[in-house]
């Protein structure tokens, strides 16, 4: 048997982290078993489905590297198939036409609620022969009257549901459009899906779908339902918890494999291992180690993993990902150091690529914004003479290398009997505008000689103006 899994999102909004984890687990299971992973777009909600959401799903999957072997298939392109199967079920007596009005169904529901009963269809049209006479009707499934629906969920174990708890669900609405529970069964059957891995909000649908599979004499897939992901406050993950769309994590500067590594550990474990390459995930993944407990999304843990990969990945690969952030900021990368060199000095100092871009823009701009507190603290008249001497020493350098730059700084600090920081910090503020940067020698080396000298001269003018104002 070839394992075939699927990811079947609805294009009614963004691709959220819960959906991404479902896609990841389905993808990993297929890859682990040398199977196939199918992408299906469940776009039957015509009012809420948008092409923008479809594109966001495709872009998110591509960014994460979750390549699919087949698809994307679209449910809206399969309506003829759903109608064909519905007519087959009608012909075999496994479905029936129902002409109950909305008013009757609403009255039935209110009466059942008043009697503290579970709202369900009462089978009013079940045994009537209703021809297609032009009166609007829906097509309902003739659910078995008795018996138990039993299945083994790979996460939750054995589940048993009495058929008396299930009513005759609608397969096709009066406008001819299929319902979710009907379309998904036909799709999984036609696409030969062997394992359905999805959120546990679908557990209640599973007994109904199993009855449909059996009515069609179709093989019933294996089911695995994944627990929900919550925010750290124990509530359902939403916008108030921060980013929820997968592409928002790209904007936040999270590396795609860092996000995958984080998500795979939300509800799945392999011993005590925390760090997984994508290949290690594929090699190790199974469903028996998926937890039934809900998971909490922790941004600190995600950023810890992200920083790990910023430091351990090749500088070239991190630089390639970082380039997108500079482009979004409108920064001309031709005006500064090679991004690989920037990554070498900044990767350990930042939790994300977005932060790395934000704190490194002074390397690529002609002008800088000064932090006024840093200027007030470090660009004081007392450092005017040492910085003037340092300016001349740096200007005279033939080789603009970090070791030569550091020699100049050391010599001037000795000449004026100053602690090294008393020279380095004013110099840092002079060339970056703030009191934080990589080591001062590397900062100047990456800035280049012309930019460093020009900014030091501008800072000296600031200090002179401040001294004359005293």
Swiss-Prot record:
Keyword check for NAD: no
Main location, first listed in the record: cytoplasm
Coiled-coil blocks: none
Xref: Pfam families: Anticodon_2, tRNA-synt_1c
Subcellular location: Cytoplasm
EC number, UniProt record: 6.1.1.17
Biological process according to GO: glutamyl-tRNA aminoacylation
Motif annotated as 'KMSKS' region, chain positions: 236-240
Keywords: Aminoacyl-tRNA synthetase, ATP-binding, Cytoplasm, Ligase, Nucleotide-binding, Protein biosynthesis
Catalytic activity: tRNA(Glu) + L-glutamate + ATP = L-glutamyl-tRNA(Glu) + AMP + diphosphate
Main EC class the enzyme belongs to: ligase
Binding of ATP, residues: 239
PROSITE patterns: AA_TRNA_LIGASE_I
Gene Ontology molecular-function annotations: ATP binding; glutamate-tRNA ligase activity; tRNA binding; zinc ion binding
Recorded superkingdom: Bacteria
Family: Belongs to the class-I aminoacyl-tRNA synthetase family. Glutamate--tRNA ligase type 1 subfamily.
Name used for this protein in its record: Glutamate--tRNA ligase
């Amino acid at each position: 048997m070839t394992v075939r899994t699927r990811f079947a999102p609805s294009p009614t909004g963004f691709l959220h982290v819960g959906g991404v984890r479902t896609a990841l687990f389905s993808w990993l299971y297929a890859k682990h078993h040398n199977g196939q992973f199918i992408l299906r777009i469940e776009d039957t909600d015509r009012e809420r489905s948008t092409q923008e959401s479809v594109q966001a799903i495709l872009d998110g999957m591509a960014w994460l590297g979750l390549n699919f072997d087949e698809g994307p298939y679209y449910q809206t392109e399969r309506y003829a198939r759903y109608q064909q199967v519905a007519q087959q079920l009608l012909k075999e007596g496994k479905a029936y036409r129902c002409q109950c009005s909305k008013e009757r169904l609403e009255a039935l529901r209110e009466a059942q609620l008043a009697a503290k009963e579970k709202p369900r269809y009462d089978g009013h049209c079940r045994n009537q022969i209703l021809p297609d006479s032009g009166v609007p009707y829906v097509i309902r499934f003739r659910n078995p009257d008795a018996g138990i629906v039993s299945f083994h969920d790979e996460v939750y174990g054995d589940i048993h549901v009495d058929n008396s708890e299930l009513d005759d669900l609608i397969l096709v609405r009066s406008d001819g459009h299929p319902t979710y529970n009907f379309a998904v069964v036909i799709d999984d059957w036609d696409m030969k899906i062997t394992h359905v891995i999805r959120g546990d909000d679908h557990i209640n649908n599973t007994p109904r779908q199993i009855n449909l599979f059996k009515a069609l004499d179709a093989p019933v897939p294996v089911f695995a339902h994944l627990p929900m992901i919550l925010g750290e406050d124990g509530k359902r993950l939403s916008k108030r918890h921060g980013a929820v769309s997968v592409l928002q994590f790209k904007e936040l500067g999270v590396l795609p494999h860092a996000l995958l590594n984080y998500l795979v550990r939300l509800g799945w474990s392999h011993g005590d291992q925390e760090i997984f390459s994508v290949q290690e995930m594929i090699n190790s993944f199974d469903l028996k180690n998926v937890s039934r407990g809900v998971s909490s999304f922790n941004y600190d843990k995600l950023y810890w993993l992200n920083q790990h990969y910023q430091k351990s990945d090749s500088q070239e690969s991190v630089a390639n990902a970082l380039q997108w952030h500079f482009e979004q900021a409108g920064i001309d990368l031709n005006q500064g150091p090679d991004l690989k060199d920037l990554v070498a000095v900044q990767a350990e100092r930042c939790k994300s690529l977005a932060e790395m871009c934000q704190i490194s823009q002074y390397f690529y701009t002609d002008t800088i914004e000064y932090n006024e507190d840093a200027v007030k603290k470090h660009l004081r008249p007392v450092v005017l003479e040492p910085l003037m001497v340092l300016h001349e020493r740096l200007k005279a350098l033939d080789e603009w290398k970090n070791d030569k730059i550091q020699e100049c700084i050391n010599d001037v600090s000795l000449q004026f009997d100053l602690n090294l920081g008393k020279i380095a910090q004013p110099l840092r503020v002079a060339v970056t505008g703030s009191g934080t940067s990589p080591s001062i020698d590397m900062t100047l080396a990456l800035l280049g000689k012309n930019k460093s000298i020009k900014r030091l001269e501008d800072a000296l003018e600031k200090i002179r103006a401040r001294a004359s104002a005293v």
